[in-house]
């Protein structure tokens, strides 16, 4: 009887030998309620236009092309569409959201608003933008773009002040100076309206430095005032630098309502597009796949900076991106990461996706879903069995009862047999 607990424990450990359930470096989903946002590496429609049609252009398995769970556009990104005239209406909905885009706005594009501007500021903007997107898509099912209507009572029109190469900023819009103003020391306003969504991500941006125009330096100052609630959001230029600064953006999450955009100095800016967030859901971390070029082009790590637990899991390849279609399309490592979309998985964690929910040699960090448990028994290669102990306890009791019955029966027959021999 005293050997029984040891027997059960040894059997349990032996049963776990040879079984391993490590976290895998993939993105996956618990069930069919998922959605992917991407670019050319997951744009099935773009592949249709290649001649000849060649699915090696993508990192996405072509079996997913007809799933209806992908919103991707070659040459674009959510950040690029949010700020610039190069626009694609990313739209999708799901409990589990995956992002594999961002590479189409990197240091390789070298965007800056003016010739003396700074691309570093735009990389900072990119990181702040995706932080808001990832955080909010952990609690919202639906993402799309909406236009933001505004009313400006002056005669001046919006101006393309901020542009570089093929990229022209149109969100926020700049309202040009009125002809009767001799300089930029003036206050001006415009009404804008947010309606139809649960919440919105909108930009509030300023030139954070001394802006030079006709020998005069100006400090940018921009505010949004919610006329329904009385809440005001604002930014004022605080830097004294005259070169090397650019358009610093904050990304506000605002409710529906009537707003007033206010400029106290320099040009008035007003949002023209917003990320529309709809359908609140239970907290579900998003998954982000690193979006970068082959090393021949300069990339950034802003999506990694923006993707932090517990609201986001980041997946990356350990090697340089080397495509088979061309060096920037069809990489084996990233194809492997996306292959997890072909099947359901029970558990997600910071380390990766677990294929089974029973036992693992690795403790899941920031776990989500039905996750395995594990323990260290000072033998790194031997995971302890951590199944539900109740069945083992019951089995032990039954075995103990069986042993007692067998012993009693043996004693009974031995005594009975001895009595018979004595009587004979």
UniProtKB/Swiss-Prot annotation:
Disulfide bonds join 44-65, 113-162, 197-276, 205-249, 307-312, 347-371. The chain crosses the membrane at residues 393-413. The active site is at 40 (nucleophile), 326 (charge relay system), 329 (charge relay system). Residues 128-266 are annotated as: Receptor binding. N-glycosylated in the RER. Residues 17-392 are virion surface. Residues 7-127 are annotated as: Esterase domain 1. It catalyses: N-acetyl-9-O-acetylneuraminate + H2O = N-acetylneuraminate + acetate + H(+); N-acetyl-4-O-acetylneuraminate + H2O = N-acetylneuraminate + acetate + H(+). GO terms for cellular component: host cell plasma membrane; membrane; viral envelope; virion membrane. Residues 414-424 are intravirion. Its EC number is 3.1.1.53. It comes from the Viruses. Homodimer; disulfide-linked. Forms a complex with the M protein in the pre-Golgi. Associates then with S-M complex to form a ternary complex S-M-HE. Structural protein that makes short spikes at the surface of the virus. Contains receptor binding and receptor-destroying activities. Mediates de-O-acetylation of N-acetyl-4-O-acetylneuraminic acid, which is probably the receptor determinant recognized by the virus on the surface of erythrocytes and susceptible cells. This receptor-destroying activity is important for virus release as it probably helps preventing self-aggregation and ensures the efficient spread of the progeny virus from cell to cell. This is Hemagglutinin-esterase. It comes from Bovine coronavirus (strain 98TXSF-110-ENT) (BCoV-ENT). The gene is HE.
């Amino acid at each position: 009887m005293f050997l029984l607990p040891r027997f059960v424990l040894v059997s349990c450990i032996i049963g776990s030998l040879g079984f391993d359930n490590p976290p895998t470096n993939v993105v996956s989903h618990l069930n069919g309620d998922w959605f992917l946002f991407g670019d050319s590496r997951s744009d099935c429609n773009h592949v249709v236009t290649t001649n000849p049609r060649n699915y090696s252009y993508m990192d996405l398995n072509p079996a997913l092309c007809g799933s209806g769970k992908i919103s991707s556009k070659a040459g674009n990104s959510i950040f690029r569409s949010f700020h610039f005239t190069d626009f694609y209406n990313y739209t999708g909905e799901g409990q589990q959201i995956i992002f594999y885009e961002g590479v189409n706005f990197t240091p390789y594009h070298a965007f800056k608003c003016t010739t003396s501007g700074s691309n570093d500021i735009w990389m900072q903007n990119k990181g702040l933008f995706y932080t808001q997107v990832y955080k909010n898509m952990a609690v919202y099912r639906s993402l799309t773009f909406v236009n933001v209507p505004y009313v400006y009572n002056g005669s001046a029109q919006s101006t393309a002040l901020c542009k570089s190469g093929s990229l022209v900023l149109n969100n926020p819009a700049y309202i040009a100076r009125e002809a009767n103003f001799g300089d930029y020391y003036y206050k001006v306003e415009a009404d804008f309206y947010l309606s139809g969504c649960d919440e919105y991500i909108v930009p509030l941006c300023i030139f954070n430095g001394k802006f030079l125009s006709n020998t005069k330096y100006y400090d940018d100052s921009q505010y949004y005032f919610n006329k329904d609630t009385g809440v005001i959001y604002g930014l004022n230029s605080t830097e004294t630098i005259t070169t090397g600064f650019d358009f610093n953006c904050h990304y506000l999450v605002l409710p529906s309502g009537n707003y007033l955009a206010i400029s106290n100095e320099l040009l008035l800016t007003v949002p023209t597009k917003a990320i529309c967030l709809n359908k609140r859901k239970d907290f579900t971390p998003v998954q982000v796949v690193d979006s970068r070029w082959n090393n021949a082009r300069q990339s950034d790590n802003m999506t990694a900076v923006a993707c932090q637990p517990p609201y986001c899991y980041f997946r990356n390849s350990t090697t340089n991106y080397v495509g088979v279609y061309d060096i920037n399309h069809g990489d084996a490592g990233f194809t492997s990461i996306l292959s997890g979309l072909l099947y359901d998985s029970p558990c997600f964690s910071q380390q990766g996706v677990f294929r089974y929910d029973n036992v693992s040699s690795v403790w899941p960090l920031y776990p989500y879903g039905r996750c395995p448990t594990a323990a260290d028994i000072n033998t790194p290669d031997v995971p302890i069995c951590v199944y539900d102990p109740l069945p083992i306890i019951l089995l032990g009791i039954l075995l103990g009862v069986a042993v007692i019955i067998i012993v009693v029966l043996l004693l009974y027959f031995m005594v009975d047999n001895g009595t018979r021999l004595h009587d004979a």
